[in-house]
């Protein structure tokens, strides 16, 4: 029996001719990632190993992003601790505030991840890089520490679900709507410890930003990773952003999948995830009359330039409804700069939007837009658990940038076709 795309990458990095689902293997790592929340714990564990250097100074990336710029004294102390460790170890990819960005937007932009890589990150949405044809997955701080010390980690080889995406999606149906539809269909544990492998002619209509969004939310279906085949769009992106060499892995024709699911993209509608789980989805036609207090457009899921362009296209020349707070957060400094150069920021501010520096911020209830008791938010983020963005009695509705921007104009969850 052949191997899936994920299994081929893992086999190569384990120095094995083949692997099979359930097999325990030790693999060599191309990149180890941490942020301002998880890295301090990893450093504490690293110090217990009795080693005085990291395995490779250029293959570790540390991105303060959750509470950046420092939101309080504790956040400042955390980043200081991480900064001092990075300087002592000579870690080349520590991203200071001037280079700031949400880690999963920043690393592809910096060319640190390429097709065929194995990447671990002490952040659950590390699965984002599957959009580039890499195997990437979230791990805990202890595994991050071991990875920094040895350049290796262990995995149980995952089985896979193949998603065959067919046809062209409608105008307002984006990668966010597709992945919300999938999560709603299979559930938050529907791909538990499985590789979600996306194929089909529908990929021709999905931009790299769409793919980043979809791979990013694989974890919300329980997936070990989400991954896309390398095609012309992938290669174009890699050529633009990196000087590293990459390797393309393809699933075998006789690869075994636990399930094969076909999705007709042309039948999908904009989709909203209701509180308090990402799989509690409804199409925009079935959301009902729901008043909101806040809109957030950003995050590692939807903070890229195409997301900001969509928001601008809907909001330009109009006004955010009085009493509604609309917060836009570019994913990186470069995205922010590009949005400035394209006039997007000007158009958004004139529409009544507040624009933040790049940060995870409100997504995890950190800062820059926390919800009070009883408040509702339409957000382009990736999780809507109880208390995720603030008070435990607040509500988060996950949606695309188009739905979020349209909702900011009306004060209700709104179909972008109607504005």
UniProtKB/Swiss-Prot annotation:
The family this protein is said to belong to: Belongs to the aconitase/IPM isomerase family. LeuC type 2 subfamily.
Q: Which enzyme class, named as a word?
A: lyase
Q: What is its EC number?
A: 4.2.1.33
- Keyword Amino-acid biosynthesis part of the UniProt annotation: yes
**Gene designation:** leuC
Q: What is the purpose of this protein?
A: Catalyzes the isomerization between 2-isopropylmalate and 3-isopropylmalate, via the formation of 2-isopropylmaleate.
| Organism listed in the record | Clostridium botulinum (strain Eklund 17B / Type B)
Identify this protein by name: 3-isopropylmalate dehydratase large subunit
Quote the pathway field: Amino-acid biosynthesis; L-leucine biosynthesis; L-leucine from 3-methyl-2-oxobutanoate: step 2/4
Which cofactor names does the annotation list?
[4Fe-4S] cluster
